């Protein structure tokens, strides 16, 4: 199989660390509401790649995370701080964040089945990895690769990463702070 390599901007042969196994990680859903077409596209593309590799004789191991806690986002594009999506939905519906997460996780799997998208082999939940995330964040802050902003959120320090922008094509000197 050949895929477009964003780093080299060329179409390359897919190579794996083990000749007969392709390990694939793809972002999974944030389970605070129904998935939309844009979300499902990600899962469909992952499924198509996995099916193609299996058709070519490779074993695939697919992992998709379930974000069931702590999803902060600025969906406005205006640089405003948005509420945690799980907590906002909890306040709106009167259900606990866990009840919401488990309900929409179930709906997500039903949607995959309806679309004939093969399920991933593993679905680790963010809520199961909080301690390791906190440890990693602490390490990033201590090493100068992340910092705490004025809003008490933790941000990655792009300046600390010499090859920042190699994948996206962005250059730090051309980016405007606070803009997407």
Region annotations inferred by a language model:
Residues 1-180:
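NTP-dependent nucleotidyl-transfer catalytic core
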């Amino acid at each position: 199989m050949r895929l477009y390599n964003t780093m080299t901007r060329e179409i390359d042969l897919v190579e794996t660390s083990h000749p007969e196994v392709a390990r694939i990680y793809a972002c999974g859903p944030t389970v605070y509401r129904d998935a939309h077409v844009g979300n499902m596209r990600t899962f469909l593309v992952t499924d198509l790649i996995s099916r193609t590799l299996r058709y070519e004789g490779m074993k695939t191991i697919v992992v998709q995370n379930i974000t069931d806690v702590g999803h902060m986002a600025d969906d406005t594009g205006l640089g405003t701080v948005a509420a945690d999506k799980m907590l906002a939905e909890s306040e709106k519906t009167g259900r606990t964040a866990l009840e919401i997460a488990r309900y929409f996780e179930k709906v997500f799997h039903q949607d995959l089945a309806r679309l004939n998208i093969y399920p991933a082999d593993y679905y680790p939940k963010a809520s199961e990895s909080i301690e390791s995330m906190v440890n990693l964040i602490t390490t990033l802050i201590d090493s100068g690769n992340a910092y705490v902003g004025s809003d008490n959120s933790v941000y990655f320090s792009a300046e600390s990463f010499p090859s920042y922008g190699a994948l996206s094509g962005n250059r730090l000197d051309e980016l405007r702070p606070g803009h997407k």
